[in-house]
């Protein structure tokens, strides 16, 4: 299964402490966050990795190269202009497997990816998300699921919230089916949550 790691953002909130390296390359105990992410994937057999890069992408490409010394096969898509956090997917869709993992590049995790993928396949979903509580749900997109864990509603941070919802947000770990990229999306920059995932809420496909 192909893994796509999104590493093209500018990481503006981190500029004050790391202006010369992209956020996924910030070291934690001496090793970049992205290296730890790739290590976790490879340990579970997910070695076919495509990284989308943009701002300071050369730092990532120089560090990981073709991925062989990390036990992976890594290729890259370089965004010459910002495409939003999902725009690059439409540029590389011919390289994707029918189902693929899509991960944020700046997340540290310890999860069973094979179980995650199997859950997605068992439910014949277009999109499967890993969710978690966070410390600032008031400015995050909140996900409301039914008793069967199907996403019933997706509230972007700018949406009104006239009632109380539990604190459940997208962790940036997804299994997607390539058919999600068959839709026509308006605009030059494409937002994953608002334009691709949110429309699936309430359809039984996520």
Label for each model-derived stretch:
Residues 25, 143-145, 197:
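A structural signal for short hydrophobic beta-strand segments in well-ordered beta-sheet cores
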Residues 61-62, 66-147, 183:
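Conserved beta-loop-beta/alpha segment of the NTase-like Rossmann-fold superfamily
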Residues 1-61:
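N-terminal glycine-rich phosphate-binding loop and ensuing alpha1 helix
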Residues 46, 100-101, 108, 114-121, ...:
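Catalytic-core segments of class I nucleotidyltransferases/pyrophosphorylases
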Residues 27, 144, 175-177:
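Short, well-ordered beta-strand micro-motif
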Residues 24, 73-75, 150, 205-206:
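Conserved beta-strand segments of alpha/beta enzyme cores
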Residues 36, 40, 59, 91, ...:
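Alpha-helical elements of Rossmann-like donor-binding domains used by nucleotide-donor carbohydrate transfer enzymes
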């Amino acid at each position: 299964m192909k893994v796509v790691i999104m590493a093209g953002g500018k990481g503006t909130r981190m500029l004050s402490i790391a202006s010369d390296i992209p956020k996924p390359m910030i070291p934690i105990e001496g090793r970049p966050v992205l290296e730890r992410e790739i290590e976790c994937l490879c340990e579970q057999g997910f070695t076919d990795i495509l990284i989308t890069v943009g701002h300071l992408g050369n730092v990532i490409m120089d560090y990981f190269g073709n991925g062989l010394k990390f036990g992976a096969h890594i290729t890259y898509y370089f965004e010459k202009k910002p495409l939003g956090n999902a725009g690059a997917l439409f540029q590389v869709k011919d390289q994707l497997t029918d189902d693929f993992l899509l991960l944020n590049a700046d997340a540290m995790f310890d999860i069973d990816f094979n179980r995650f993928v199997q859950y997605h396949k068992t439910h014949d979903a277009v999109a499967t998300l890993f969710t978690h509580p966070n410390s600032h749900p008031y400015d995050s997109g909140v996900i409301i699921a039914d008793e069967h864990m199907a996403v019933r509603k997706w509230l972007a941070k700018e949406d009104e919230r006239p009632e109380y919802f539990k604190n459940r947000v997208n962790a940036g770990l997804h299994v997607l089916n390539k058919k999600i990229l068959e839709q026509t999306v308006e605009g030059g920059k494409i937002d994953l949550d608002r334009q691709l995932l949110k429309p699936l809420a309430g359809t039984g496909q996520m």
